[in-house]
């Protein structure tokens, strides 16, 4: 008779063998965006109620380690997450992980690993599909409010982030995982059977998420976890409120204890401790280029020193100096509106945001005149909290605050330095105000030469640098675009001339991981535009597409032979 242990082992092996045969629901599609029109009164009422709930009192955000909530209890530091539109308002007091907490989180991830990856794919998938449904229904307005208040987004920017994109990540990753598991060797010789097993990575995954997209946090933890990995997650301090809500939703959806461990804390202290563990298996990162370079170097050093059991996977998406290139044949009105959206929505705090603009001399005056007229007439200047879409006053505004004082100070320096630089001219804006919130207005700066540092430096704010090129030098300007910046994240060409489009498409092949023709360089949609850049913008593993999941599996190929040998010699060994 088979022992209970043997039966359990057979069950788990069978669960792996069935991975490629379980299909996700056929109705998986992109989550529809709620438009929040004037007539959508119910949506507005529900949103206002959630905003009021989060503004009325400060929430205590704990650590979540092995399913246990750990509060400060006067033993741990607290980080006050404030409303960037009203920096006197504390939205959440975020518990900071100690060294012991980090150690416990790593241990919890290791201890949960076997049961989690042995759980059949169907069951793992069901958790993320349910979480997506909870986000898009029961928790929709709470998630919107937490993201709007904590991260400075208007309702539309929050909707396309923490609701639609987040839900899309979870749903489409289930589909992509099913497709990946189904990829098996296409040939088996007579008397043999070949099969591929998509194992999780050995060890645990360390996920480091940024402030600017709640959905990115879902991607960073969801992709590895779905594939059977366990995760230690360090969220951004300034997105802790929405990220903690995401954690609670996953738990409600059935996520087992220890699979994802939520540990906000000092970035350097937490990261150094995690990277020192021999079972560190992968880094899944979104953030600044300099931080990613530093982590990359530390991991490489750890490999050289023999610190790790395996070669850790490194998956990262960082910064960009993204371009809009306008050809003389372009529809100028469309290019203007696209550039306003691509540059100034969410205050330019998207890694994909347009930051450099190349205009033909013959169309420059028309383009800039139209742009400035629109910016002024529509009052796209978030100079006080009463006008901010997340202050509780005007919920319909286009722009809001930048995330915190450090960002505000950096952007102010960019503006003030531009005023002193004889090779730069501020054409529009340059306003800022921190009396109540961290507000920087839309700013357009003209550079006299295409290699000025303002054409290559990422600002991560509502600042656009413009260079005017002679109409006859379109080909040359494509060369300049390709060689100006260390980044290669997003870019766009605006033109009606098909030859110009074809030339730019080919010449700028390696200048952007996401290239747009007659559209703004932001707004990638899961499953439609797989997102990620190369060069110093990251490892280009394409979040929102199927490739990203392959980075979190280790493939084992098994050959089973059904024939028994009768001789050790091959035919060619006989005379």
Curated annotation (Swiss-Prot):
Single GO MF descriptor: 1-pyrroline-5-carboxylate dehydrogenase activity
Entries under InterPro entries matching the protein: Ald_DH/histidinol_DH, Ald_DH_C, Ald_DH_CS_CYS, Ald_DH_CS_GLU, Ald_DH_N, Aldehyde_DH_dom, P5CDH/ALDH4A1, Proline_metab_enzyme
Induction (UniProt): By proline and is regulated by a common control element encoded by the PUT3 gene.
E.C. number(s) listed in UniProt: 1.2.1.88
Site entry: Transition state stabilizer: 212
Keyword hit for DNA-binding: no
GO biological process: glutamate biosynthetic process; proline catabolic process to glutamate
The protein's annotated pathway: Amino-acid degradation; L-proline degradation into L-glutamate; L-glutamate from L-proline: step 2/2
Listed NCBIfam families: D1pyr5carbox1
UniProt name for this protein: Delta-1-pyrroline-5-carboxylate dehydrogenase, mitochondrial
The organism of origin for this protein: Saccharomyces cerevisiae (strain ATCC 204508 / S288c)
């Amino acid at each position: 008779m088979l022992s209970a242990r043997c039966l359990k082992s057979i069950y788990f092996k069978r669960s792996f063998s069935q991975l490629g045969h379980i299909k996700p629901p056929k109705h998986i599609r992109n989550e529809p965006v709620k438009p929040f029109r004037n007539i959508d009164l119910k949506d507005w009422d529900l949103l206002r109620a959630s905003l009021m709930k989060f503004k009325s009192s400060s929430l205590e955000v704990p650590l979540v380690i092995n399913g246990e909530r750990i509060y400060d209890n006067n033993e741990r530091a607290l980080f006050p997450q404030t409303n960037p539109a009203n920096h006197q308002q504390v939205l959440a007091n975020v518990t900071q992980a100690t060294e012991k907490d980090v150690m416990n989180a790593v241990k919890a991830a290791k201890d949960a690993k076997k049961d989690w990856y042995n759980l059949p794919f169907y069951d793992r998938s069901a958790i993320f599909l349910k979480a997506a449904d909870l986000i898009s229904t029961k928790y929709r307005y709470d998630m919107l409010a937490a993201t709007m208040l904590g991260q400075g987004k208007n309702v539309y920017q929050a909707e396309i982030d923490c609701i639609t994109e987040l839900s899309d990540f979870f749903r489409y990753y289930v589909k992509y995982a099913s497709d990946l598991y189904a990829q098996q060797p296409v040939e088996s010789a007579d008397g043999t059977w070949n099969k591929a097993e998509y194992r999780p990575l050995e060890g645990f995954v360390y996920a480091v998420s940024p402030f600017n997209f709640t959905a990115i946090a879902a991607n960073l933890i969801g992709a590895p976890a779905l594939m059977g990995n366990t995760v230690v997650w360090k969220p951004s301090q300034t997105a802790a409120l929405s990220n903690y809500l995401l954690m609670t939703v996953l738990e409600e959806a059935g996520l087992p204890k220890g699979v994802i461990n939520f540990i906000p804390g000092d970035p350097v202290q937490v990261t150094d401790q995690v990277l020192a563990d021999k079972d560190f298996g992968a880094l899944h990162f979104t953030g600044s280029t300099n931080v990613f370079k530093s982590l990359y170097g530390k991991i490489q050093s750890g490999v050289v020193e023999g610190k790790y059991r395996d070669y850790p996977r490194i998956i990262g998406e960082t910064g960009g100096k993204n371009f809009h290139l306008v050809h003389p044949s372009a529809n100028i009105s469309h290019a203007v509106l696209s550039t306003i959206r691509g540059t100034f929505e969410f205050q330019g705090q998207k890694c994909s945001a347009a930051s450099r603009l190349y205009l033909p001399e013959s169309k420059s005056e028309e383009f800039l005149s139209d742009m400035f007229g629109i910016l002024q007439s529509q009052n796209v200047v978030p100079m006080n909290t009463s006008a901010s879409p997340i202050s509780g006053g005007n919920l319909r505004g286009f722009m809001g605050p930048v995330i915190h004082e450090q960002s505000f100070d950096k952007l102010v320096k960019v503006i003030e330095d531009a005023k002193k630089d004889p090779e730069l001219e501020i054409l529009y804006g340059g306003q800022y105000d921190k009396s109540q919130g961290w507000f920087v207005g839309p700013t357009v700066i003209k550079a006299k030469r295409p290699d000025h540092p303002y054409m290559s430096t990422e600002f991560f704010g509502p600042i656009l640098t413009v260079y005017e090129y002679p109409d006859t030098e379109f080909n040359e300007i494509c060369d300049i675009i390709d060689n100006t910046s260390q980044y290669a994240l997003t870019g766009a060409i605006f033109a009606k001339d098909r030859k110009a489009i074809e030339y730019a498409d080919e010449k700028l092949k390696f200048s952007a991981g996401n290239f747009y023709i007659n559209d703004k360089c932001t707004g990638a949609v899961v499953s439609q535009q797989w997102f990620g850049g190369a060069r110093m913008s990251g490892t280009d593993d394409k979040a929102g597409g199927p490739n990203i999941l392959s980075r979190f599996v280790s493939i084992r190929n098994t050959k089973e032979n059904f024939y028994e040998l009768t001789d050790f010699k091959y035919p060619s060994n006989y005379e």
